[in-house]
Amino acid sequence: YQSGNAIGIHSYSHDYKKIYTSPQAYTGELLQTEQLIYDIIHVRPVISRAPGGTSGHFTPAFWKAINDIGYIEVGWNALTGDADGTGKTASKEVENLRRQLVIRPYLNTHLVILMHDAAGHEATVQALPDIIKLLKDQGYTFRVVTTAIPPSW
């Protein structure tokens, strides 16, 4: 964040059965995580990304609840396959993304890619330089996520 990156919240527990029981459960986790982040770096994030995405989890009440506490939800509209097992190698992840860019040309106006860098996702880290090159070669630019970002869907 000190170099200009955004800080967002994903959840505290990542427990779907817990966080999606109600809008209050979800926002409670956001606020719990927000406080933890604030205690460490003195920044209060207002951006979240729902574990597993909002589709199938969020109802209008969830959208209202996050809006009521001043958050925006930033979802993804493309993925490398590192979460579903289709991107087992760096080259496969790059190819998964390349294929999506071809079949979804509307992504050229607003692309948010689901990628993970935690343990077990070493292929994603290895794929990142090639993904950046692929996107730059196709004219994409990179920006920091802010509250002004339009929805990715």
How would you label these PLM feature ranges?
Residues Q2, G8, S13-L114, A118-K136, ...:
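Catalytic domains of cell-wall/extracellular-matrix polysaccharide-remodeling enzymes
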